[in-house]
Curated annotation (Swiss-Prot):
The gene is glgB. GO terms for cellular component: cytosol. This is 1,4-alpha-glucan branching enzyme GlgB. Its EC number is 2.4.1.18. One of its GO terms (molecular function) is hydrolase activity, hydrolyzing O-glycosyl compounds. It is an enzyme of class 2 (transferase). It comes from Granulibacter bethesdensis (strain ATCC BAA-1260 / CGDNIH1). CDD domains: AmyAc_Glg_BE, E_set_GBE_prok_N.
Length: 734
């Protein structure tokens, strides 16, 4: 064949576009094509010295491709539309490959339709990189990796990696115009392949290389590339847990959460997900927590963000290992009956050039106007939740963690910043909604849709809101006009009660209402009481460090506070280190001071937390009616002079009631009369002043007999000794 055969020549402009990586439709040029004179095969191989089409079975030559352009375009006429492979000789050796440009469309019609509509709920399955097997035009099964990325305004998209010397000209992708998605199947690639996307913007400008927004696996920072994840499905053995998690996470069940930053919990001994599981799981079991909540495990470039500036919304952070080892951690927690909550950040994302920022040369994931699209507090971009494709991206991320990784709940971060357009903004720095108000209607719609999708796609999973304002109906169902969350962090309770506990006891009478005000609204939502990581950072000091007095009083205050918290309506959350009375505040580089457990006072607090969890789970009155007024009644609410609080907790009619009394001064109170609903013997089932916890062992000798003296609107009453800076808990013997 003549090398200058006009049938195989490419128009000079087309050749230039291919060679310079500026052609937006490579499938119209490369691969096999039928012309008026016959079948033509074209291939772009810039490093090749020769290219031969060979029979896939026998390896015999079908045709030699001739160089029709000096910079790497080869072409030949074939005898017909036959199957072939390419034998490529370069200066470094010979490779035999399947041609990526002979495979048909990869995404199905329904996926493309849902992508175009912005209504796809499982983008983790459709976009990104997936090891798969495709059928070649001649019917052979060809293994490789399917890539797909949403970049509607890009004029060219390519997959790059060491397999093509990071040359964006070698593997340009096909654009599915109707959905704005670029796709390509590259034969021969396998799990573990490191890759990025090279994009040209709307004006043909070369953009910063991009990590895959939907990658399931990524390099360890500061490296920024994505990695093709293993195709083998994880072998889950948590069926029993998954079937019952909906019941175990209901509002009438005990939920006690241990919040963990995975890389700093025990960094010297837990360097990966597997060793973390080895130590964390028995520890959490021994303390009696029902759930572990992880600060964001999604891949994030800056460790100092604690995960709250994620870019890999589908990838567990590689700092601790593979996606499979993270799945194993979840599975092992489930096997021993411990639920897994993941912090999840749909409010904003970092500005790193390799991430989502101006992904295709336009404000694709973010708003164009910084008054809507930039968060000045965190120097991050805000997701454009008015764009259906962005909503679908985040919805799919949530579904991904709850289904593929079996997470039981997502704690949605920074909800308040999503709900208000003027959140942390000065006058002139925000744009009102369509009605002139400050409410972010797009975010409201997104959160309602999120709750609806989660309930249908992940039965039994729950959503928890970190929401710090008085927005009504956060935990009301979406179909009733609420946001649809299952629980909400009670930030007001946390701020008020911590402020009270920080006061010297001599001043507490002036702040008495801070301990009682939370009950005014305690049943307006379904609440979690959070003593989270946010309360032990940035100069706030540790929980122990906030307590006033000498060493004995500081520990006693903390123990009494925990007793108050564990008996107060609402689910419980404690950040790691709180259970051992950490002395220093936390940072991601400091972690937990486990050496403190060599000291009796710290051992005592740890034992108290374990006993509180055990008691909480054993007494239905402490959880059955967490979200209902008839599960709680004040007995002593107004003794501000002595800083005493007393209340009853009730469960179902068949559940024994529980009496809680807090004395938050260092002065013991003797013969303190408190009314109770029935006579008989009331056993003291927990006393935070017990000697085993480091207290003074002041108490009631195991219990008290109620007499017939009416008090506090009850027919009987107890005369109790109230230990100093302590909470005592009693229940009727029969």
């Amino acid at each position: 064949m003549n090398a200058l055969d006009p049938d195989t020549l490419i128009h000079p402009d087309v050749a230039t576009a291919i060679i310079h990586g500026r052609h937006g439709d490579p499938f119209s040029v490369l691969g096999i094509h039928t012309t008026r004179e016959g079948v033509v095969l074209r291939s772009f191989q810039p490093e090749a010295t020769s290219v031969v089409a060979i029979n896939p079975e026998s390896g015999q030559e079908i045709a030699t491709l001739h160089r029709v352009h000096g910079d790497g375009i080869f072409a030949a006429r074939l005898p017909g539309r036959t199957g072939y492979r390419l034998k490529i000789v370069t200066a470094t050796g010979t490779d035999i490959i399947d041609d990526p440009y002979v495979f048909p469309n990869l995404l199905g019609d329904l996926d493309v339709y849902l992508l175009a509509e912005g209504r796809h709920e499982d983008l983790g399955r459709v976009l990104g990189a997936h090891v798969t097997t495709m059928h070649s035009p001649d019917g052979r099964e060809v293994e490789g990796v399917r890539f797909a990325v949403w970049a509607p305004n890009a004029t060219r998209a390519s997959v790059i990696g060491s397999f093509n010397h990071w040359d964006g000209r070698c593997h340009p992708m096909r654009k599915r115009v109707e959905a704005g998605v670029w796709e390509l199947f590259i034969p021969g690639l396998t799990a573990g392949t490191i890759y990025k996307y090279e994009l040209l913007g709307p004006n043909g400008e070369l953009l910063p290389l991009k990590a895959d927004p939907v990658a399931w696996y990524a390099e360890i920072p500061p490296a920024t590339a994505s990695i093709v994840a293993s195709p083998a499905p994880f072998q889950w053995t948590d069926e029993q847990w998954m079937q019952q998690r909906g019941r175990l996470q209901a509002a009438d069940q005990p939920i006690s959460i241990y919040e963990v930053h995975p890389t700093s919990w025990m960094p010297a001994k837990c360097g990966d997900w597997n060793t973390l599981a080895d130590r964390l799981i028995p520890y959490v079991q021994s303390l009696g927590f029902t759930h572990v909540e992880f600060l964001p495990v999604m891949e994030h470039p800056f460790g100092g963000s604690w995960g709250y500036q994620p870019l890999g919304q589908f990838a567990p952070m590689a700092r601790l290992g593979t996606p499979e080892s993270f799945a194993s951690l979840v599975n092992r927690l489930h096997e021993v009956g411990i639920g897994v909550i993941l912090d999840w950040v749909p409010a904003h994302f970092p500005t790193d050039a390799h991430g989502l920022a101006r992904f295709d040369g336009t404000a694709l994931y973010e708003h164009e106007d910084p008054r809507e699209g930039y968060h000045y507090d965190w120097n991050t971009y805000i997701y454009n939740l008015g764009r259906n494709e962005v909503r679908a991206f985040l919805i799919s991320s949530a579904v991904h963690w709850l289904t593929y990784f079996h997470a039981d709940a997502l704690r949605v971060d920074a909800v308040a910043s999503m709900l208000y357009r003027d959140y942390s903004r000065k006058h002139g720095e925000w744009i009102p909604n369509m009605y002139g108000g400050r409410e972010n209607l797009e975010s409201v719609s997104f959160l309602q849709h999120l709750s609806t999708v989660v309930k249908s796609r992940a039965p039994g999973a729950v959503l928890i809101a970190e929401e710090s304002t008085a927005w009504p109906g956060v935990t009301r169902p979406a179909h009733e006009g609420g946001l649809g969350f299952d629980y909400k962090w009670n930030m007001g309770w946390m701020h008020d009660t911590l402020h009270y506990m920080q006061e010297d006891p001599v001043n507490r009478s002036w702040h008495h209402d801070q301990m009682t005000f939370g009950l005014v609204y305690a049943f307006s939502e379904k609440f979690v009481l959070p003593l989270s990581h946010d309360e032990v950072v940035h100069g706030k000091r540790s929980l122990l460090g906030r307590m006033p007095g000498d060493e004995w009083q500081r520990f006693a205050n903390l123990r009494a506070y925990y007793g108050f918290m564990w008996t107060h309506p609402g689910k419980k959350l404690l950040f790691m280190g709180g259970e051992i009375a950490q002395e220093q505040e936390w940072s991601e580089g400091h972690g937990t001071d486990w050496y403190l457990l060599d000291r009796p006072n710290h051992q005592g607090v740890q034992r108290l937390v374990a006993d509180l969890n055990m008691l909480y789970r054993a007494e239905p009155a402490l959880y059955r009616k967490d979200c209902a007024w008839d599960g709680f009644s004040w007995l002593v609410i107004d003794d501000r002079t002595q800083s005493v609080f007393a209340y009853m907790r009730y469960g179902a009619d068949s559940d024994a009631p529980v009496l809680v009394v807090c004395n938050l001064t260092p002065v013991p109170r003797h013969d303190y009369r408190i009314g109770v609903p029935q006579g008989g013997y009331w056993r003291e089932i927990l006393n935070t002043d017990a000697g085993i916890y480091g207290g003074s062992n002041t108490g009631n000798g195991g219990g008290r007999m109620a007499d017939a003296t009416p008090s506090h609107h009850h027919p009987a009453s107890l005369q109790l000794t109230l230990p100093p800076l302590a909470t005592i808990i009693l229940k009727p013997e029969s």
